[in-house]
Amino acid sequence: MWVWKKHIAAEHEEEWQERLAEFPWAVISALPHAKRLLVEVYDEAPGKLLALYSCYGGDCSPVEEKDWVAATAPENTPPLIIRDRLVISADASEAKINELQARYPGRIVLSFPAERAFGTGNHATTSTCLRMLCDEAKKLAPGQWRLIDAGCGTGVLGLAGMRLGAQSGICYDFDPIAVEVAERNLQRNGGAENLRLFQADVFEWSPKPEEKAHILLANLFSTVLQRAFPRLKACLAEPESVLIVSGILREQAEETLAAANRHGFELLRRVTAGKWVTMKLRQRS
């Protein structure tokens, strides 16, 4: 086993995620008390890693023998750092969460272990949605906005939104297993008293007027999104409300954006992470 390592500026994290999308064993992690991030890419052979070294510098070396099963266990998996607001751990132990809270004072620490539902935070679609959610929440007064997470999976986006200042929120998923997993995650983390969770179909459910969202997240398949834009539009509280959509393969991005445009949305931001695209949309004025 070989590893290539390089320190990068935090503001370049997204472009490095895209650059390293072909490497299944690529990890970007924050170091305690450091302003820069550490990129590590592992491979059985040095060839591709030496190519990275040739292009970008850093360090390439063989890895000492160790128990890789233990090394990749949840308690040894680096937490996901989202902006300066969120820390998401795959570990469910109270001791680990307390340790992370001490290591990252002032940040919101959440526990989302891998289960049968999608969305622990590490997938490019979920992590990009989380970054956009953090950015949008900063613009809104705490306790003065509402959130909807359509196709919530584990519930990570909805709970993050509540912790970031939403007054109330709604999470729903078509998959009953996802709803079960999300319920466990909300109970473990707390802070979801004003977050309503239930099973529903994006093509059938509609919010009451007082439930409509200022931030609406929909991390769904692009084919579902293209059909769901009219329903999603009806979930927005006001023309300035933001719709964040993901789950879009890069080759399906243009047709998905065209569908959004047909239903009155304009593109505010687009982020590509590997083969996945996330978009921030708003109703055209």
PLM regions: where:
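Active-site-adjacent beta-strand anchor residues
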Residues: 6, 111, 119, 172, ...
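Nucleotide donor/acceptor-binding cores
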Residues: 108, 143-145, 241
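N-terminal auxiliary segments of SAM/dcSAM-dependent transferases
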Residues: 1-101
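SAM-dependent Rossmann-like transferase core, predominantly class I methyltransferases
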Residues: 69-141
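A short helix-to-beta-strand connector/capping loop
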Residues: 56, 84, 105-106, 167, ...
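S-adenosylmethionine
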Residues: 174-285
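Conserved SAM/SAH cofactor-binding pocket of Class I
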Residues: 116, 122-204
